[in-house]
Amino acid sequence: MAKGILGRKIGMTQIFDENGVLIPVTVIDVEGNVVLQQKTVEVDGYQATQVGFESKREKLSNKPELGHVKKANTAPKRFVKEIRFDALNNELLALEVGTEIKADLFTAGEDVDVTGTSKGKGFQGNIKRHNQSRGPMTHGSRYHRGVGSLGAIKGNMKGKNLPGQMGNEQVTVQNLKIVAVDTENDLLLVSGSVPGPRKGYVVVRSAIKKGN
């Protein structure tokens, strides 16, 4: 059954498995997930589960937001997302509004996809942004780190490699394995790295493509 949960990236560490093999893992805090709404085909045109994570003060919320979370009998949330899968496979659809989702939703050994916002790098040139090669750095060369030839004078195609904003975009890493689940502290330990900085919000979903 497909499922999902919201969380905050704490950072990376490493653990040893039963064979003594060192595994780098990312620690994700999933404490405080609450089902805020169940979307239905009859009312909304599709099926999904709206989940909220990490409470915030009521002073920081507007009246529509307060009315929405009141139906779930919970505090306003900082991070709200919809977990959407095929209706027959979505395990979250069986949960009632206001139900708290814990780390034990997942078990060690499951494959997951983790979505987050990558670190923003600001305005960057082609060498860093698109991994292009630089020109000669010797005396007399007029081309060092420039863009180079862009083709015709007029009518450049959209998507051409040019300098611009780098990072700060949604990134999904697929087929990561849950190495361990800490039910006491509501933590997930996921193999490898996940997108975004420390304390960044992430969405952990069941893997769409199963790993080999």
From Swiss-Prot:
GO MF annotations in UniProt: rRNA binding; structural constituent of ribosome
SUPFAM superfamilies xrefs: Translation proteins
GO biological process, one term: translation
Gene3D superfamilies for this protein: 3.30.160.810, Translation factors (2.40.30.10)
Membrane-crossing residue ranges in chain numbering: none
Keyword list, A-Z: Ribonucleoprotein, Ribosomal protein, RNA-binding, rRNA-binding
Any coiled-coil regions, as ranges: none
HAMAP family: Ribosomal_uL3_B
Subunit annotation: Part of the 50S ribosomal subunit. Forms a cluster with proteins L14 and L19.
Family: Belongs to the universal ribosomal protein uL3 family.
Protein name, as recorded: Large ribosomal subunit protein uL3
Naturally occurring in which organism (per UniProt): Acholeplasma laidlawii (strain PG-8A)
Highest classification ranks of the organism: Bacteria, Bacillati, Mycoplasmatota, Mollicutes, Acholeplasmatales
Chain's gene name: rplC
